């Protein structure tokens, strides 16, 4: 296990370096700069600002300085938020995105597994058809449309919940449901498919022959093996939800990482775009490694060491 972890960490460092390099190159390949949109900025003032942030240095030197900062944990200053570093902004915005993401993750997991299990326990029934149709709609319909529908019907027409900002539990309902809808539908499909396969296994037939009830078979024998594909899916899903959905945070005016990222693109805030990209990539890599380490604990047939399964 230790050798596997170190091997994965070594690969993760290479992946992050490639991501930093490619993103840095793309940012500097785009015409213009972070201060090009300033109206009638005097050349002397513009030159002074660029010198302050070392934007007048050769690109290779900027890359070396930035890479050195990343190694020490410094993601640099924000070009558009005067006096604030990228680390500070991430530190302020990430807890909000994390709260939104964690709540959405819990709703998606609980709702998806429950719906998939009920559907698999009653195949070809009305409940099964309803879950299948709803999960198909949930996967197919874009998140921004789901959000817009919830805002209009639940927020404006029914007036049950606020439709903007992030100030308390009632403000969380619509954003969480919007963000959880697609992964919940996908988890329901994965759970249903996995359970239908498991229910065909010999040990399930033996359990039924012994007179065990449906819920006992589900919870003690079937569900653990059926949700293995769900666990694999949770790594990238958790990273995506924890860093916040750009669309959801924009629709509901939530001051999380997603909204800051969208603003930074319009403002060409290079360091912030790079910082968010690095942060998001590191989180994805870390969570994928974590899921790979947890996977063998759930299914002993899976091993992380080469050659041990031969």
What residue ranges belong to the model's regions?
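Membrane-interfacial helix-loop-helix junctions in multi-pass membrane proteins
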Residues: 51-60, 75-83, 187, 263-271
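Hydrophobic alpha-helical transmembrane segments of membrane transport/permease proteins
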Residues: 16-64, 80, 155-174
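An internal, D/E-rich "acidic patch" concept
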Residues: 56-113
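Juxtamembrane/transmembrane-helix interface segments of polytopic membrane transporters
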Residues: 19, 23-27, 147, 151, ...
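Alpha-helical transmembrane segments of integral membrane proteins
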Residues: 2-3, 90, 94-127, 143, ...
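Membrane-water interface segments at the C-terminal ends of transmembrane alpha-helices
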Residues: 23-29, 66-68, 133-162, 180-182
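Hydrophobic aliphatic residues
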Residues: 26, 30, 38-42, 71, ...
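N-terminal signal-anchor/signal peptide hydrophobic helix marking the start
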Residues: 6-16
């Amino acid at each position: 296990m230790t050798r596997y972890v170190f091997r994965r960490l070594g690969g993760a460092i290479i992946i992050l370096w490639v991501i930093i390099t490619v993103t840095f190159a793309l940012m500097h390949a785009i015409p213009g700069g972070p201060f090009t949109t300033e109206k009638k900025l005097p050349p002397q003032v513009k030159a002074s600002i660029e010198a302050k942030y070392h934007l007048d240095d050769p690109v290779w030197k900027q890359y070396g300085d930035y890479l050195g900062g990343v190694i020490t944990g410094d993601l640099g200053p924000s070009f558009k938020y005067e006096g604030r570093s990228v680390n500070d902004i991430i530190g302020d915005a990430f807890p909000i995105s994390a709260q939104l993401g964690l709540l959405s993750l819990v709703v998606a997991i609980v709702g998806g597994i429950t719906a998939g299990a009920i559907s698999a326990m009653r195949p070809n029934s009305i409940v099964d058809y309803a879950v299948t149709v709803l999960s198909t709609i949930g996967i197919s319909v874009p998140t921004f449309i789901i959000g817009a529908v919830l805002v209009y019907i639940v927020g404006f027409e029914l007036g049950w919940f606020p439709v903007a900002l992030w100030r308390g539990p009632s403000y969380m309902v619509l954003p969480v449901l919007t963000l959880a809808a697609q992964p919940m539908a996908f988890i329901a499909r994965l759970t249903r498919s996995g359970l239908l396969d498991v229910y065909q296994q010999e040990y399930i037939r033996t359990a039924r022959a012994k007179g065990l009830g449906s819920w006992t078979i589900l919870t003690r024998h079937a569900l653990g093996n059926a949700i293995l594909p769900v666990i694999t899916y949770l790594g990238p899903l958790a990273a995506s939800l924890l860093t916040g959905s750009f669309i959801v945070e924009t629709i509901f005016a939530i001051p999380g990482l997603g909204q800051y990222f969208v603003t930074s693109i319009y403002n060409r805030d290079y360091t912030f775009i790079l910082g968010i990209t690095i942060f998001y990539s590191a989180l994805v890599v870390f969570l994928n490694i974590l899921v790979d380490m947890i996977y063998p604990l759930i299914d002993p047939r899976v091993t992380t060491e080469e050659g041990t399964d031969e």
